Amino acid sequence: MTITKAKIAAMLSSKLGFSNNLCEEIVHTVFSNILEIAKEQKLTLKNFGSFEVKQKNPRPGINFHTKAPVIIESKKHLRFVPSSKLKALINESTR
């Protein structure tokens, strides 16, 4: 299931009784702050999981079209590790 920030804001608005515009601003601010923190350091959301930016080292690869060896450049990737509580909730709901 894919959910948009607008849908999250609409759900908050209906649940809390705030205006949709205020809820959209809150959701945007929360996600922006999470992204800023996650860019710089490991971010752990209690009972949800951890986000961490990791650096991948350069490595050898092969160009599939020419079969020539190439070096795949280093790059950053985002790693998410779910908390044990989130894992338990997911496994509990599938039983």
From Swiss-Prot:
Superkingdom of this protein's organism: Bacteria
Gene Ontology MF term list: DNA binding; structural constituent of chromatin
A GO CC term attached to the entry: cytosol
Keywords: DNA-binding
Family note: Belongs to the bacterial histone-like protein family.
Protein name: Histone-like DNA-binding protein
